[in-house]
């Protein structure tokens, strides 16, 4: 199967402690790697104010992960677990050219 590039952007709640945020990012990077994806880059982008309130939050820390993967298994697992995480307010997976 062909290797494809993806960009995953997720928003982390702003009131999380720095150590917990680092553990969260490491855990989700590991989920991708354990399911067959290669994490090319994983970094915080910025803490930004939202156009509308998400839950009780008006801002959040955007985190961007660039990955390559041969199948959708790692992305599907990331998507499934991100939906259950209270620390991730929103997430988006985009296939890159």
From Swiss-Prot:
Sorted UniProt keywords: Ribonucleoprotein, Ribosomal protein, RNA-binding, rRNA-binding
UniProt keyword Thylakoid present: no
InterPro entries registered for this protein in UniProt: Ribosomal_bS6 (IPR000529), Ribosomal_bS6_sf (IPR035980), Ribosomal_S6_plastid/chlpt (IPR020814), Transl_elong_EF1B/ribsomal_bS6 (IPR014717)
SUPFAM superfamilies per the UniProt record, alphabetical: Ribosomal protein S6
Lineage top rank: taxon: Bacteria
Molecular function in Gene Ontology: small ribosomal subunit rRNA binding; structural constituent of ribosome
Family from the record: Belongs to the bacterial ribosomal protein bS6 family.
UniProt GO BP: translation
GO cellular component labels: cytoplasm; ribonucleoprotein complex; ribosome
Designated name of the protein: Small ribosomal subunit protein bS6
CDD domains documented for this protein: bS6
Function per UniProt: Binds together with bS18 to 16S ribosomal RNA.
NCBIfam families: S6
């Amino acid at each position: 199967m062909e290797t494809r590039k993806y960009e995953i952007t997720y928003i982390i709640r702003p009131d999380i402690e720095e150590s917990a945020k680092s553990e969260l990012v490491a855990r989700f990077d590991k989920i991708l790697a354990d399911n067959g994806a290669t994490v090319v880059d994983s970094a915080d982008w910025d803490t930004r104010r939202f156009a509308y309130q998400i839950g009780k939050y008006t801002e959040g820390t955007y985190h961007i992960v660039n990955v390559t993967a041969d199948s959708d298994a790692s992305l599907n697992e990331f998507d499934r677990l991100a939906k259950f995480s209270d620390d991730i307010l929103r997430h988006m997976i985009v296939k890159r050219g």
